[in-house]
Regions:
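ASCE RecA-like P-loop NTPase motor cores
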Residues: 1-142
Length: 142
């Protein structure tokens, strides 16, 4: 609610279970191909992590048998950014995890059609996207 008040944006994409806090029908996992937010300013809130077994099943289906566990506060470098993230030491599992998370975030951010429309998408996540411009915000101090 603080984010919504701070940004003033009507449209939000976040987790399905937070739907009661914002308007609209889109959420992580169900926004691919939707054009209803074209040209609209959007807040994308959250990082769409998947259960650990999904990353491992993905690796296993590619023929890899990986035995690694998620490690909190791991310093990583991705998309030109260095940040701390709960991820794997194993490079393959990390690549799979990042691909799945990044794909879902790109789908959410892409609903505004930023390349064709003059609008703004605020991404509130601990996973920066390649085209992100990092800004320090004081929304949580008010």
């Amino acid at each position: 609610e603080k984010i919504k008040k701070w940004t003033g944006f009507e449209n939000t994409i976040s987790f399905k279970e937070f739907h009661k806090f914002y308007m609209g029908d889109l959420h992580f996992g169900n926004c691919a191909g939707c054009d209803i937010l074209k040209g609209e300013n959007i807040d994308v809130i959250g990082t769409p992590h998947q259960p650990e077994w999904i990353y491992k099943l993905f690796a296993y289906s590619l023929g890899y048998d990986v035995d690694d566990r998620l490690k909190p506060n791991t310093q990583v470098e991705h998309n030109g950014f260095r940040f701390y993230f709960m991820t794997y030491t194993d490079k393959l599992l990390r690549a799979i995890q990042f691909y799945i998370i990044e794909s879902e975030l790109e789908q959410a951010v892409g609903r505004a059609r930023l390349l064709r429309c003059d609008c703004v998408v605020n991404l509130f996540s601990d996973f920066p996207l390649r085209q992100a411009t990092l800004k320090e915000a004081k929304y949580d101090t008010e």
